[in-house]
Curated annotation (Swiss-Prot):
It catalyses: 4-CDP-2-C-methyl-D-erythritol 2-phosphate = 2-C-methyl-D-erythritol 2,4-cyclic diphosphate + CMP. Binds 1 divalent metal cation per subunit. One of its GO terms (biological process) is terpenoid biosynthetic process. This is 2-C-methyl-D-erythritol 2,4-cyclodiphosphate synthase.
Amino acid sequence: MRIGHGFDVHKFGGEGPVIIGGVSVPYEQGLIAHSDGDVALHALCDALLGAIAEGDIGRHFPDTDDKWKGADSRALLRDVYRRVKEKGFALGNADVTIIAQAPKMAPYIQAMCNAIAEDLETELDNVNVKATTSERLGFTGRKEGIACEAVVLLVKAS
């Protein structure tokens, strides 16, 4: 059994929508990033990579490489999960916490869970996504960006 933790943050800027959890969420601004800026999937990638002792997303998909410019984070997540399977592990469960004052995530949570479960080749009840605010405190509370944390449990593949 292995546990991994991931964290990511991106600042708002430019045109919307926000891509998060593999889902397009309408908002007047997008997130500034080298890829599509999906903080949820980036945190999840880091959690998975941490659990298999393979560093972080920046090591595998560096923002200094134009190959990853505008990259679809779902493709990155699938690539990371391929590495997890190559190491002999499978997902036990994943828990993702989005920290954002805006946009409201509730209408999109189920679609996020569906996308993540599909990309991680697992049952829907092995994936949880939730959103919270920081009670108007800090950069997320001032609507300057979005943060996300993810925790995964990996089990030996059968």
